[in-house]
Amino acid sequence: IKSRLKPGVEFIAVMKGDGYRHGIAGLYPTLKECGIDSYAVAIWEEGKMLRDAGATESILILGDTADDMLDEAAKYDLDLTVFSMEGAENMAAAARRAGKKQNVQIKLNTGMNRIGFPVCQESFDTIKKICEMDDLNVTGIFTHFARADEGDHTSARKQLDLYLHAVNELEKM
């Protein structure tokens, strides 16, 4: 798969649910041999499991990280998902306590309706402010398509269009 990617495109292994019940620690050495560039997990404990298994690559927590776990996430050098100004401020405070910048990725809500900034001007303004925060390093932006596995891709296409619109608007700012 990686050989088919364009140069500069990262190959990310999603390891939610303890590696989809295969065991994160056991899968890590094999995935490393495959040339995985970074990892994504659902919760900070899974990120810790990867670090404990020897992972030095970037690890993104896809879900919400509770405020009382932000210091632990910083300790294990885990990238966080941000989807509110309040969350960003709490992440920045934890980064200051840790004495380092916190890597974060912006989550957009294009239809899954769990977490994420809605695609609207108010969100774009908030995201711009987050990008300007001294203690945060915004490394990316992502979404999670709802119903993407259905045979009819109409819904997924609408979500992709919404995501691309948001990225385009943010790049203008």
Each language-model region and where it sits:
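Active-site-proximal beta-alpha core segment in soluble small-molecule metabolic enzymes
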Residues: P7-M173
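Conserved PLP-enzyme active-site core in the AAT-like
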Residues: R4
